[in-house]
């Protein structure tokens, strides 16, 4: 592991990170063509007094693809791995359950991964031509309001999790394939096509715009949950937008504004969110 007050990496070629990088004061910046984190974490923990809401604690700028290769696991409040657990959906929300008693949620358990970007309560900014999150984490949860901004010029595959206590904004010019996008405040996504396998959740109230605000140009395939726990869901897009809500799909919110050329619903649509 490498620990320093600030970590700044810049290369015209590719960057491969296979050991943890920890910035304790001024954050982390990475500029490269492609970047891969293989079972390694980039961690930024600037003191709260020095943190600036407009300055990312982790700032990634790539002309190519960001790839995270890791293993999801569950952890306690101190980051220690909890064995014998898995992630399930309950009323549209991801919960960590005991594999021996699948109906029992494990109290105080948190999602984690051995690969990813961690900036507790601080902003994370990612600009890249592509994203492949294979079991990794992009995480700015904590006691503050750190937000996450993603600007992806092509496709984005999120088979890990992306989570923040602040606003999560993602613009994807290609197809977004998602497992878990989680915001304790607002979630705003703009993409060409959306394939949601598990959870896209916004747990905060509306703040002038709907808490869960989705703009999809062409097609939505939902086999998981689109959940606004305390606010509204807005789902709009191009003139030919097609929405398919599969049998396992949930669209749950306190009010829905859905406009599409075609809507095929075999799942659940509800204007009152669970919880």
Over which residues does each language-model region extend?
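Low-complexity, glycine- and small/polar-enriched segments
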Residues: 1-275
